[in-house]
Amino acid sequence: METREGSLTWSVLKCDLHPWIKEAIKSLGYPTMTPVQASTIPLFSGNKDVVVEAVTGSGKTLAFVIPVLQKLSNRLYNIDEEGENPEPVKKGHMLSIILSPTRELAKQIQTVFDKVLEYIPEDKATIKTQLLVGSLSSVREDIDYFLTNKTHILIATPGRLLDFLSSNYVKTNSVEIAVLDEADKLLDISFERDVIKILKQLPKQRRTGLFSATISSAGDTIFRTGMANPVKIVVKSKNSKNAAPTSLNVSYMHVEPETKISALIALIKDYRFQKCIVYFPTCTSVKHFYSVFQTLVNVEEEDRYKFFSLHGQLSTKPRLKTLQNFSEGDSMLHKHVLLTTDVAARGIDIPDVDLVIQLDPPTDPDVFFHRSGRTGRANKVGQAIVMLNNNSREEDYVNFMEVKGMTMSNMECPNISKIHDKFQKKFRKYMLEDRARHELAIKSYVGFVRYYSKHMASSIFRLQTLDYVGLGKMYGLLRLPKMPESRYIPNEEMPEDGWLGDVIDMDKYEYADKQKEESRKKNLEEDKARKVHDAKKRKELKVKNEAWSSKTDKIETKQERREKMKRKREAIEKQLMDDSSSDEETKVDWKEMVKTNKKKKTPSDSMQGSFDDL
């Protein structure tokens, strides 16, 4: 089923709603239905499973709230054919489950339910809701509240609901209707396993509804939800080529990375709005720039703006409190600016949001639709802007999103020549005041590079084309950190030793927190002492190594001398041997001569003597 945007009166609805529901709709100020409500309510209130895809801000929440309350009213209030009152709900049983990917959206859905439930007549039993999200309370406390309060509708995030259903005190046999809001997100890899486990615990005869602005991205996974012959309802804008509602204008802006924050400040100052949502890529970047804006922008502008910070690293209570303050704050007194991540991208319905700014495109193109859809809701005019880096392939993102059904117009970057240099000087001074600020800036910078590398449109968002130096200046870095991606910086653009400005002595760069600074100095002294000690040890080791080397040389010299003496001794012995052989021959000759002479002597000769002395 395919419908176009438009409005219809509730009187033409092909479904006989309970009188109290009609009264609630009228009292809450909904004089007409939106197309998605007119198409969905009759089918989902009956016996049809539905898969609903409609542009953001088209009224999808009410399109499932009314069918859920209609079914529960039939179960709790209708007298059967025999005139008997309906059977009461057993302890530990619930009648409906609503799943949401985020705590903020779950809380918002509960708020819509509770507003309608205020109009239940006093003579009828109250229909009760319960919020199940992490960090608000323990699972044990949730179960105790459920059993005591006899809850009918559970509105939950998948992880907490799965823990909740693991209790033996909780039964799912009576569930009649289940809803997956932002179903494409619930059926992606991050939630799919938990969601399928939950749905398998529910009765097969239940009714199931899937709702999202981009449900088609869920693909074949929807068939694993246990739906029986679901009806697909697609609600398009009047301009069927554009997935955005006609009240929403989406633009792109080419900006140098270095000047991106200056451009953002210029937009916040010059654009007329009551509430603005600015999307950052990571939680650390939200924390970093929230502090920057609170310190620099508000001081200069005398608190003309009220900044809010919302991200996934906040616990549940602060997140919900921040969202409430941003939603209910007096935007006529101060311009309200919410700095956030994709935690506030889906389903959040905040009144009077006129402007949405995306500092960088999201890694998932489907999220682009959801981010942009936080403004231009309920036929109110809204402006969404995405910043694209100059001198990169990011300009191809415009054509990429057009293929996805999102048409964007070009918007000129505001004139920032007067404010950029002034802001950069203040930014650097701000960074030098506290070492912790620089550490957070480095984490934000590194986190963004990781974020950039995970883009689904990897042919457009390439690490090789990223302006790392400009990006470092945008985050206020004093020096680029050493990381593998730095190899993509051309040699002629790489600052000397990574410094983005004047070189500073990092040993003297202090924390503003005195306790932290004392600890740093202590660690610094210990490091210096350790370095001196290590240097001394290395010197001793060197001397030791040299002594061993000298000893080895002596041993080798001695060995050589021994071999030389051996060779000399052998030479002498050989000479002696030669001399000994010659003497033997001489001795033999002499003996022969003596022998010969003896033979020549006569006897007279032997008796002859001299008598001269006589």
Curated annotation (Swiss-Prot):
Gene3D superfamilies, per database record: P-loop containing nucleotide triphosphate hydrolases
CDD domains named among the record's database cross-references: DEADc_DDX55 (cd17960), SF2_C_DEAD (cd18787)
Region feature (Disordered): 514-614
Superkingdom, natural source: Eukaryota
Record motif DEAD box, residues: 181-184
Protein purpose: ATP-binding RNA helicase involved in the biogenesis of 60S ribosomal subunits. Binds 90S pre-ribosomal particles and dissociates from pre-60S ribosomal particles after processing of 27SB pre-rRNA. Required for the normal formation of 18S rRNA through the processing of pre-rRNAs at sites A0, A1 and A2, and the normal formation of 25S and 5.8S rRNAs through the processing of pre-rRNAs at sites C1 and C2.
Family: Belongs to the DEAD box helicase family. DDX55/SPB4 subfamily.
Assembly description: Component of pre-60S ribosomal complexes.
Domain notes: The Q motif is unique to and characteristic of the DEAD box family of RNA helicases and controls ATP binding and hydrolysis.
Name of the protein in its database record: ATP-dependent rRNA helicase SPB4
Origin species: Debaryomyces hansenii (strain ATCC 36239 / CBS 767 / BCRC 21394 / JCM 1990 / NBRC 0083 / IGC 2968)
